[in-house]
Amino acid sequence: MEKDLVIIGGGPAGLAAAIAAREAGVEDLLILERDSRLGGILNQCIHNGFGLHTFKEELTGPEYAGRYIEKAKSLGIPYKLNTMVVDLASDGSLKKITVMNREEGLYEIEAKAVILAMGCRERSRGALNIPGYRPAGIYSAGTAQRYVNMEGRMPGREVVILGSGDIGLIMARRMTLEGAKVKLVAELMPYSGGLKRNIVQCLDDFDIPLKLSHTVVDIKGKERVEGVTIAKVDENSKPIPGTEEEITCDTLLLSCGLIPENELSDSLGVAMNPVTSGPLVNESLETNKEGVFACGNVLHVHDLVDYVSQEAEQAGKKAAVYLQGGLEPEGKAIPLKAVNGVRYTVPSSIDISRMEDLQTVRFRVGNVYRDAKVEVSCNEQTIRSQKKQILAPGEMEQVILKKSELEAIDNLEEITFSIKEL
């Protein structure tokens, strides 16, 4: 089978990218989705808060996904469900995608361009090295969310949550609304990993304690969780002896970070960012592999699905431009350097000759900063400065760069992003 464009993943990123590519003139494209339905993780996110930027109204996850699914179907975009991509390789300008499903078995698709939109997965207990037995009652927050919201099953009645990522915060509220008692949320870092609005709406409004600089050091119970031991940690994240506290519970939910799912990217030889665990991309969201683009949570973990859709639309448009022969490199790639509190930037390089008039650069900081400013500089010249009352790792930030400003700078070698405290 041959295709001009294949989108791997039928979640919010894959759908938005496919729609943008079709509207930009790509007729021969295909979405590959391993689940039994389109929509990705949004299908289990039945809470509201989606769509405020994209649709200017508040939607639930399934409602948000439904609008993109309807649009994709109205445009006649083909898709395959229950279809797993098991390998991705490059053969010159063509990309070879090895695919498997029940109806057609194992087969290969050759594509001129590929958009990576595989999303991310949760960090498991094994990756956290929590001591103790392995009893029933330990779940990732996303697994518990699927059980409650899609399958109508309650994971437990007395709950402790480790990690204050957005999924964990939302599940603290969800479990409470379903009748469970959420004893507390413990967070290893001295700050929350979630959005401020989720801390207020999901914890404060329900009087659920948030213990910062705490972690789980032991799990009690052999057949079923009977309790956990938490302890305060020092500045090196090591438990402090004598601070242990035993909490009775029958369920432990883990919300300890998300990891972009990039096994396929690795098999293709895509260059990866060690900070985000996602691909390094340029201003067109193209990886180091020609004709391979990345967007959404496979690129870097987002706070809001609206930003995923915006990013994916750009990837879809640029893939269309590539297929039409319009992405030939004309200038040199200018690296974007993250220093002084900025952990990374997306994109990681910009070819000014190929960038749009306005280029969005998204980034995260590595700590909590109050009364600070984000500075963007080129050749020791500040071209952008934004004052911020607060900057936190749990909130993605962005800066808009103007093509005209960058073109006016002589001998531009790199663009530096940094945090300056006032």
Sequence positions of predicted segments:
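Short, aromatic- and glycine-rich surface loops/edge beta-strands on solvent-exposed regions
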Residues: V374-V376, S404-L422
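A Rossmann-like FAD-binding core segment of flavoenzymes
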Residues: A72-V99, T176-E263, D357-Q389
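Mid-to-C-terminal Rossmann-like scaffold of FAD/NAD(P)H-dependent oxidoreductases
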Residues: D306, Q314, K318-Q386
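Beta1-alpha1 glycine-rich phosphate/pyrophosphate-binding loop at the start
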Residues: K3-I8, P12-R67, K71, P155-I199, ...
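Predominantly flavin-linked oxidoreductase catalytic cores and closely associated redox partners
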Residues: L106-Y107, A113-L210, T215-R224, G291, ...
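Exposed aromatic-hydrophobic patches
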Residues: R362, G394-L406
